[in-house]
Each structure stands twice: as structure tokens, then as C-alpha cells.
């Protein structure tokens, strides 16, 4: 009888401890949620500034926010019409969340989904760096599947909307030392100065297998492939062609060049 009571008491104590612990864990998760959201926003702002060539490494959160607010303008783009839109608030709108909502996105036919993202949001957010009303840099969000993961990043274009000012990813799960070399500063530096379009205005940017021949007429559009990471390289090439194509920013860039965005 005594053993039975002891066992019951032990089980009750264990149950109470579990319940109390679960309450604390749930409470901590709720309490930390705003902080986690702020940190994600800060990381995103830091990435945008870096791609645009603004700021210095090691800036504090306050410095990042101040520089972002003073130099970067966020605007929402209607990808269907290729024009700026007031349909969404650029500060509160989340394109990635919208891409999962059938009411705010469209399913992509397999033949057109070269970036393997399945759905594309109808509105997205772009970022502009301007001086005295003149566009210096345009930052476009891009994403697509590599070998093991979806890569999320930004492509920065100079004011001519043809020359690459910066390119990089802020989130992915590619293999370190192979596909993970998309984070290598040397590889990212290869993109700066490359041009997206040829003399006829056709999209010509390309990641090639091996190294670019500097004497080639196509060298200005080409970037070295990642050694030992053919599928990641192909994935990056595909995602760029998707987002610069008709289902991405093609119409928007055309309108912006004409001053009609």
C-alpha cells in the first residue's frame, strides 16, 4: 500500500512538473516572438544594405536601422502589371508569406517553374537607393531551389538596370564547401560589374561550368560555376532567369526603363 501511494505521489509530482514546464516554455516562446521577428527584420535589412554596398561590417542594430531608413526606400510591385502598387503596405507586407496564400499568389505550371518555387506571389517588395530623386541602385528579391534547399537572396542592379551592383543569399541549406560557396566573398565579387542583357536586349547572364574566358565576347554576361556544385550552380542560374523573366521582374524592369513603373 505504501509503495502504491509513493508511486502515485511520484507520478503526480512528475505531471505537475511537466505542466509547469510546458507553461513556462509556451510563455517564453510567446514572449520571444517579437524579438525573433525584430532580429529577422534586422538581418534582412543588413543583407539589403550589404548587397547595395552600403554600411560597414559590425554595425550595431541601431546603426543598421538608421542607415536603412535614411538610404533605402521599400516599394511594392505588382508583378502582373509590372508597376508600383499601393495594394500592400511595403513595411508590413511579407511576400514569402503571401506566396503560400492561394488568395495572394498563383500556382506555377511545372514547365515554367524553373526556380522550383511552386507558387509566386502577385505582389512583392523591391528596394531603391536614390540620390536627389535619381535611381542609384535597385534591389530585387530572388529565390529558388538549389541542390538541397531553397536559396533566398537579393540581386542589386545599378541605375542602368543592366549592370550588377551586388548579388548574394541571406538564407539557404546548401552543402558547406560545395554549394555553400555561394557565400564565398570571392564568388560574390565575380558578379559585380556583370551585365544582364546583350546588345539586342535579350537576357544573357549565365553561370557557366568552369571558368569564364576573359577574351570571350560573352564574358561580361558570364560567371564562373561553383566547383563541385553543378546542381547548385544550375539552381542559381535558373532562379535568376526566372526572376528576370516574364513571371518575375521582366515587365517591371521594362516599365522602369521607360519611366512608366
From Swiss-Prot:
Transmembrane segments: 11-31
EC number: 7.2.1.1
Enzymatic reactions: a ubiquinone + n Na(+)(in) + NADH + H(+) = a ubiquinol + n Na(+)(out) + NAD(+)
GO molecular function, one term: oxidoreductase activity, acting on NAD(P)H, quinone or similar compound as acceptor
Entry membrane topology: Single-pass membrane protein
GO cellular component: plasma membrane
InterPro entries from the UniProt entry: FMN-bd, NqrC
Keywords of this entry: Cell inner membrane, Cell membrane, Flavoprotein, FMN, Ion transport, Membrane, NAD, Phosphoprotein, Sodium, Sodium transport, Translocase, Transmembrane, Transmembrane helix, Transport, Ubiquinone
KW DNA damage (keyword) present: no
Function: NQR complex catalyzes the reduction of ubiquinone-1 to ubiquinol by two successive reactions, coupled with the transport of Na(+) ions from the cytoplasm to the periplasm. NqrA to NqrE are probably involved in the second step, the conversion of ubisemiquinone to ubiquinol.
Family to which this protein belongs: Belongs to the NqrC family.
Stored PANTHER family: NA(+)-TRANSLOCATING NADH-QUINONE REDUCTASE SUBUNIT C (PTHR37838:SF1)
Protein name as catalogued: Na(+)-translocating NADH-quinone reductase subunit C
Organism name: Pseudomonas aeruginosa (strain ATCC 15692 / DSM 22644 / CIP 104116 / JCM 14847 / LMG 12228 / 1C / PRS 101 / PAO1)
Amino acid at each position: 500500500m505504501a509503495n502504491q501511494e509513493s508511486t502515485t505521489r511520484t507520478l503526480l509530482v512528475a505531471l505537475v512538473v511537466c505542466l509547469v514546464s510546458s507553461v513556462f516554455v509556451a510563455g517564453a516562446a510567446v514572449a520571444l516572438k517579437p524579438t525573433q521577428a525584430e532580429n529577422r527584420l534586422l538581418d534582412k535589412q543588413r543583407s539589403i544594405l550589404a548587397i547595395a554596398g552600403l554600411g560597414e561590417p559590425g554595425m550595431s542594430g541601431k546603426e543598421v536601422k538608421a542607415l536603412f531608413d535614411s538610404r533605402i526606400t521599400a516599394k511594392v510591385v505588382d508583378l502582373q502589371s509590372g508597376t508600383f502598387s499601393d495594394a500592400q503596405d511595403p513595411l508590413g507586407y511579407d511576400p514569402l508569406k503571401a506566396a503560400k496564400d492561394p488568395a495572394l499568389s498563383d500556382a506555377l505550371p511545372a514547365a515554367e517553374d524553373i526556380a522550383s518555387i511552386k507558387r509566386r506571389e502577385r505582389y512583392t517588395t523591391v528596394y531603391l537607393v536614390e540620390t536627389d530623386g535619381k535611381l542609384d541602385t535597385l534591389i530585387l528579391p530572388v529565390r529558388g531551389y538549389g541542390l538541397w534547399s531553397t536559396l533566398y537572396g537579393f540581386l542589386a542592379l545599378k541605375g542602368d538596370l543592366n549592370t550588377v551592383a551586388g548579388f548574394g543569399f541571406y538564407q539557404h541549406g546548401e552543402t558547406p564547401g560545395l554549394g555553400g560557396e555561394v557565400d564565398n566573398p570571392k564568388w560574390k565579387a565575380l558578379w559585380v560589374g556583370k551585365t544582364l542583357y546583350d546588345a539586342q536586349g535579350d537576357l544573357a547572364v549565365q553561370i557557366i561550368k568552369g571558368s569564364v574566358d576573359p577574351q570571350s565576347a560573352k564574358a561580361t554576361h558570364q560567371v564562373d560555376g561553383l566547383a563541385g556544385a553543378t546542381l547548385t550552380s544550375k539552381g542559381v542560374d535558373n532562379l535568376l532567369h526566372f526572376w528576370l523573366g516574364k513571371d518575375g521582374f521582366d515587365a517591371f524592369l521594362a516599365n522602369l526603363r521607360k519611366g512608366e513603373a
